[in-house]
Amino acid sequence: MNNNAFLNQVGGVSLALGMALTVGAITPLSAQAQELDPNATEVLQFMSDYLADTEAFSVNADVDFEIVANTGQKLQFSSYASMVMQRPTGLFIQRRGPLADAEIFFDGSQITLFGRRLNAYAEIPLSGTIDDAIRTMEAETGLPFPGADLMFADPFAVLSDGVESSTYLGTAYIDGVEVHHLAFREADVDWQLWVQTGDRPLPMKYVITTKWVTGAPEYSIRLRDWNTSPQIGANRFTFTPPAGATLLEALPPSELEDYQEAQ
């Protein structure tokens, strides 16, 4: 991607879009959203290639997810996540929220799910890659892992699968950083991605909207503290049970419940 040329175009697109929305001229945007926008595809591909070529990284995230109660009231819950990854076989995820306080370890030979509140853990033997670990965790627990798309060896293939239309919405700012704003539509969900401009196209925000569920609940991830050259300890991806920890066949769903709300 020629970033300088592209950014020169971005300013004009943003201004035109802002003027169109100001005067209520939404028809052109609606028409544009019915097809794949090459600018959105270009940014998504650039980001995906960058992540795929990054051998190791660490990142923290603030996660907000919504649920719609039986009364129709929409509630939002917040949690925190931290991840360290070293391709192709090292993954550590920590998640703390109103329900879950869990850690996930993968060292290329075994997945370990550790529930801190229960001081209990479950093991899943698996010889494979991070891609295999993500798919196995979803299959074994029955829970989706929103945002895991960004961890795959080929993020573009996973993210673009099922996309029916896309739109490049210009640039914005997240935490003072200029970002490209992309919007995508699939059959059951809409999702948006904010990607840092320049030569480090890191994802800064990811929002998934489940559009056919009453209230259209959203799952939002703000990614921060990116480190693409982390110092990783030799045992970072290997679980060592703490004193008194219990080995279970599987963790209760409540220990991972925060992962369940956005589908």
Language model region names:
Residues 249-263:
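A short, highly charged, low-complexity intrinsically disordered segment
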Residues 35-38, 62, 112-113, 122, ...:
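Gly/Pro-enriched, hydrophobic low-complexity segments
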Residues 1-8:
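N-terminal secretory signal peptides that target proteins for export/translocation
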Residues 34-43, 114-178, 241, 258-262:
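Flexible, processing/modification-adjacent segments and terminal tails
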Residues 12-25:
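Bacterial N-terminal signal peptides
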Residues 26-33:
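Sec/Tat signal peptide C-region and signal peptidase I cleavage site
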Residues 70, 102-106, 115, 123-126, ...:
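A short, polar/proline- and glycine-enriched secondary-structure boundary/capping micro-motif
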Residues 35-120:
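N-terminal mature ectodomain segment of secretory-pathway/periplasmic proteins
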